[in-house]
UniProtKB/Swiss-Prot annotation:
Domain of life, source organism: Eukaryota
GO molecular function: calcium ion binding
Biological processes annotated in GO: homophilic cell adhesion via plasma membrane adhesion molecules
Transmembrane feature ranges: 691-711
Residues on Cytoplasmic side: 712-796
GO cellular component, one term: plasma membrane
Keywords: Calcium, Cell adhesion, Cell membrane, Disulfide bond, Glycoprotein, Membrane, Repeat, Signal, Transmembrane, Transmembrane helix
Organism of derivation: Mus musculus
Name assigned to this protein: Protocadherin beta-14
Broad class of the protein's primary localization: membrane
Entry's localization field: Cell membrane
InterPro entries: Cadherin-like_dom (IPR002126), Cadherin-like_sf (IPR015919), Cadherin_C (IPR032455), Cadherin_CS (IPR020894), Cadherin_N (IPR013164), Protocadherin/Cadherin-CA (IPR050174)
Keyword check for Signal: yes
Lineage: Eukaryota, Metazoa, Chordata, Craniata, Vertebrata
Length: 796
């Protein structure tokens, strides 16, 4: 490709040709570009994508990057097009000096996977410098006795360009005595020699002035001129001569300014002023003139500025010794600069990834190059990082290294690493360079939230206020950022009957649990559910914990008396035989409390009784017992008021009224069964059963009466006296029980007990007494008392 460069001041056009070369050597590819110096910034060097055989997508995906030696980047890669552009205008003389060819090295880094491709730019010289003489006038003294053919070297011109653009030829102005020859130095430089064609005559012309022109071969060529003044001298027989024509010496590059390098010596056999010598540099380059100086009187060559082996390894110069008569002699001095380990290794960071994911082994952290301009062992380098760090250095081509992770990192264990890269050379003493980089380990969502407990137990007292805070669950996540942001939730309960969403709510941000409504211990003593903690990562991770809510009982239920049932229409009556001993069990009050714990601990107390001191109740089991023997003075009917109280705070109580009927000769206490709650559906069936049973008993009773009457009529025995007692003979049904006692009730009663276990009800039916033929007064009185007794109980 061709690029036209316009230089405004001169209004001329310079054509720059940029071409691409692919070199394949030793199985590796080197991309070589050729660029003219002074090409404008941003100019196209080549299309890197095409030159590498990659598509633009591949070039971007693989993370192509241009690396230059040193810290100065000369090229830039245009990602959207794959073009390689100049980052700045390049000056060959500044970058390479007199070195030819001028080659600038760079590397192409493909990051994924890592691959280095060597590249170089051959910086082509343009003729942007004209030859220039260091002196405006060159003084040359020649003896008039010099013979034709004598050669007189002249000082050279300097041209910073190289190749054909540097000095290629010298010319001298037309004259009658001299012609000019252009010679080649061993280093390739051109120098002029003046050749005498015709003998000189001082008396005829004591001084001759000539114009010396230096010309390069650029396009267009450039020239430089100086004046040569030739002074014709009288005859002088002897010219100065050096002890040797070539001097070679070595000097350390760290030699201080002013240090002695070499002393050259010449002698002149003439006496007087013709034997006095002066020394000077002759036909020397700018580099020599800047680095060394010669003592004109002693011939000592001393260091003029600090030398640098890495810049120039040797100097070649001509030393001229001139006597007072104008004659001179010359010698060549070659100074070799010796390398010392004066340069510490340099580290140039090309790629630095300051944040890497925690779970990726062999992840590229940095790519860097190291260099040491010293030579030999002074330029050999070793590179390392600290021990016990999970990082490895992998060497690449041309002193490039890749720093990678040795294994997967764990941000939760260590979130930051300070890595010190140490580069040491092998010189004596060793010089070291250290570069510290900080690498942050980025988080990935590799840790699920962890609850502080696997299960939580929370207590809430029943009858709580709605929205009551009952407890808090807590989970932690070792990750960071959104990966550690935890959201709490209620998980569906295992029991489908548990309406969890109507009982409990949870704050999704902080895990606080609230009771949505008042809880009832008697309906629900405890329930369990699971809570979940989910982080904000992608994909999200979660965990769960068990929460058990225990409802604490409040004393909100009064005791309930199961037995005896309190029914206003039919008060419960217990029968107590008058012959009962003290401690006789009259009945037992049975009560329950729907509360629990001490709220359900019941105690019994006798509050009120018809006959104080006759009855007592056991506080813990509700048994009503007699406290003494009954007497004739005790009224036959007693009313007891009992209190059933729980142990809650505040306590609740219930009262029960008990009727006790004193009877003579009753051998067993009357133990009515408590009436329990019945299902209305069962009550109809039980009623039917009861009617059937009642009809059966009535029929049996009627048959018994008829049998009894028949037996009485058939008896042939006479009636007994008034003091006797007629006892019916024959078989009595099993439901007729003799209750004859020793007391006041000497008559025989028959009674029917109807007990139905299913209903818990009881009925007593007293029949009329079977009266013998009592004619005495006592028998009448007893009958009257019994009648009164019946009436008081409401029996007929």
């Amino acid at each position: 490709m061709e690029t036209s460069l316009h230089k405004a001041p001169q209004k001329r056009q310079v054509t720059a040709i940029i071409f691409l070369l692919l070199l394949w050597e030793a199985g590796s590819a080197t991309i070589t570009y050729s660029v003219l110096e002074e090409t404008d910034r941003g100019s196209l060097v080549g299309n890197l994508a095409k030159d590498l055989g990659l598509s633009l997508r591949e070039l971007i995906t693989r993370g192509a990057q241009i690396l230059s030696k040193g810290n100065k980047q000369l090229l830039q890669l245009e990602q959207k097009s794959g073009n390689l552009l100049l980052k700045e205008k390049l000056d060959r003389e500044e970058l390479c000096g007199s070195t030819n060819p001028c080659i600038l090295h760079f590397q192409v880094l493909l990051k994924s996977p890592v691959q280095f491709i060597q590249g170089e730019i051959q910086l082509q010289d343009v003729n942007d410098h004209a030859p220039e003489f260091m002196e405006d006038e060159i003084l040359l003294k020649i003896l008039e006795s010099s013979l034709p053919g004598a050669v007189f070297p002249l000082k050279i011109a300097q041209d910073l360009d190289v190749g054909s653009n540097t000095v290629q030829n010298y010319t001298i102005s037309t004259n009658a005595h001299f012609h000019l020859l252009t010679r080649n130095h061993s280093d390739g430089r051109k120098y002029p020699e003046l050749v005498l064609d015709k003998a000189l005559d001082r008396e005829e012309q004591a001084q001759i002035r000539l114009t010396l022109t230096a010309m390069d071969s650029g396009s267009p060529p450039k020239t430089g001129t100086t004046q040569v003044v030739i002074v014709v001298l009288d005859i002088n027989d002897n010219a100065p001569e050096f002890a040797q024509g070539l001097y070679e010496v070595q000097v350390q590059e760290n030699s201080p300014v002013g240090s002695l390098v070499l002393t050259v010596s010449a002698r002149d056999l003439d006496a007087g002023t013709h034997g006095e010598l002066s020394y000077s540099l002759f036909q020397s380059s700018n580099q020599v003139l800047q680095a060394f100086e010669v003592n004109t009187d002693t011939g000592e060559i001393r260091v003029r500025k600090l030398l640098d082996f890495e810049e120039i390894q040797s100097y070649r110069m001509e030393i001229e010794a001139s006597d007072g008569g104008g004659l001179s002699g010359k010698c060549t001095v070659v100074i070799h600069v010796m390398d010392v380990n004066d340069n510490a290794p340099e580290l140039t960071m090309s790629v630095l990834i300051s944040e890497i994911p925690e779970n990726s082994p062999e992840t590229i952290v940095a790519i860097f190059g190291i260099s040491d301009p010293d030579s030999g062992d002074n330029g050999k380098m070793v590179c390392s990082v600290q021990d016990r760090l999970p990082f490895l250095l992998k060497p690449n081509e041309e002193n490039f290294y890749t720093l990678v992770t040795e294994r997967a990192l764990d941000r939760e264990s260590r979130a930051e690493y300070n890595i010190t890269i140490t580069v040491s050379d092998m010189g004596t003493p060793r010089l070291t360079t250290q570069h510290t980089i900080t690498v942050q380990v980025s988080d990935i969502n590799d840790n699920a939230p962890a609850f502080t407990h696997t299960s939580y137990t929370m207590f809430v007292r029943e009858n709580n206020s709605p929205a009551l805070h009952i407890g808090t669950i807590s989970a932690t996540d070792s990750d960071s950022g959104s990966n550690a942001h935890i959201t709490y939730s209620l998980l569906p309960p295992h029991d489908p009957q548990l309406a969890l969403n109507s009982l409990i709510s949870i704050n999704a941000d902080n895990g606080q649990l609230f009771a949505l409504r008042a809880l009832d211990y008697e309906a629900l003593q405890a329930f369990e559910f699971h809570v979940g903690a989910t982080d904000g990562g992608s994909p999200a991770l979660s965990s769960q914990a068990l929460v058990r809510v225990v409802v604490l009982d409040d004393n909100d239920n009064a005791p309930f008396v199961l037995y005896p049932m309190q029914n206003a229409s039919a008060p419960c009556t217990e029968l107590l035989p008058r012959a009962a001993e003290p401690g006789y069990l009259v009945t037992k009050v049975v009560a329950v409390d729907r509360d629990s714990g001490q709220n359900a601990w019941l105690s019994f107390q006798l509050l009120k009784t018809t006959e104080p001191g006759l009855f007592s109740v056991w506080a813990h089991n509700g048994e009503v017992r007699t406290t003494r023997l009954l007497s004739e003075r005790d009224v036959p009917k007693h009313r007891l008021l009992l209190l059933v109280k729980d142990n809650g705070e505040p306590p609740h109580s219930a009262s029960v009224t008990l009727h006790v009927l004193l009877v003579d000769g009753f051998s067993q206490p009357y133990l009515p069964l408590p009436e329990v709650a019945r299902d209305p559906a069962q009550e109809d069936v039980l009623t039917l059963y009861l009617v059937i049973a009642l009809a059966s008993v009535s029929s049996l009773f009627l048959v018994s009466v008829l049998l009894f009457v028949g037996v009485r009529l058939c008896r042939k025995a006479g009636e007994t006296s008034l003091g006797g007692c007629s006892v019916p003979e024959g078989h009595f049904p099993g439901h007729l029980v003799d209750v004859s006692g020793t007391g006041t009730l000497s008559q025989s009663y028959q009674y029917e007990v109807c007990l139905t276990g299913g209903t818990g009800t009881n009925e007593f039916k007293f029949l009329k007494p079977v009266l013998p033929n009592f004619l005495n007064e006592g028998g009448y009185r007893n009958t009257e008392e019994n009648s009164n007794f019946r009436d008081s109980l409401g029996f007929s």
